């Protein structure tokens, strides 16, 4: 019997890197909502008293970027007396956006391998490799460690926003270690939560008293609600439980650490449980296969698991810049497939159109911000891009495709 412990982490929306992801995707949403053909590659950096957006944009949209950035920062919670050194109302906002390179644009605008099919006209925006993954550990077909870490991070933010724990501040991280036996989760080994808080908590200012209060509050208001519906639950007796191990966490957010778009790619995906091609998502329009093809790879992997063809599935796609068809497609089922990996790969090639133009059209990726009231991608920029039952994501809706695969 094989026994091991696997760990994944998540971060809250107030983490410096996640602020940047949300700002970059808010810029993307604003541009696509006005002009669905916008080409966007937006990077954000934050530090004490500063937020800068930079990158390349080609769009007919007219956006007040400074106002937009301030709104995102304020919504996250960095404003007013508790903002520290990073206040939405007073931080400097710098905008340094250029137009997309014409050398890149020509390959995306007209693919090298087009042959009359309109979907062949959209080439990949860059070369690269993308991975998608799914497994049967959770109802959303995600690995349990990252699923739990996201649950805790979202609940941590919720009790801050709704005032249940009014001493909490926006920055925070969660980490969950799960015990596996024969590749199946059997216990929750460790829960770690680091959360920013005010200098005084409940009238207390001593570090030990504050830490004990936060530890108890988080178990009651974060851990228990976040895991209430799970069959595999943590317990105070059997689960190691760590809160703010350094003792206190008062200085946080961009005042404590600089942030940058695209530095939480493992949090965004599968928590390290599956491989990653290296490309980040946020701030990139759908012609960037780093994003759209990673969504498609998840769709394929989830459909394979949902269909019963595999208990675990990892899908690798690769692309060449300016070429529509994938360079390669590979499926790995880790011995859980009802047929061989070669047969699974052949099924994918037959039943999924993985050209960038087809991915964009099938998921409606250019039109989603407009269709969802001006905001779509920003909602994916915190708490994961996959397994999100709260966001109605098109790449998570695999019921029809799974049925198609069952009949194949």
Swiss-Prot record:
This enzyme's EC code(s): 2.5.1.6
Requisite cofactors: Mg(2+); K(+)
A Pfam family that the UniProt record links to this protein: S-AdoMet_synt_M
Entry binding sites for Mg(2+): 17
SUPFAM superfamilies in the record: S-adenosylmethionine synthetase (SSF55973)
Cofactor binding note of this UniProt entry: Binds 2 divalent ions per subunit.
Protein name (Swiss-Prot/TrEMBL): S-adenosylmethionine synthase
Source organism per UniProt: Synechococcus sp. (strain CC9902)
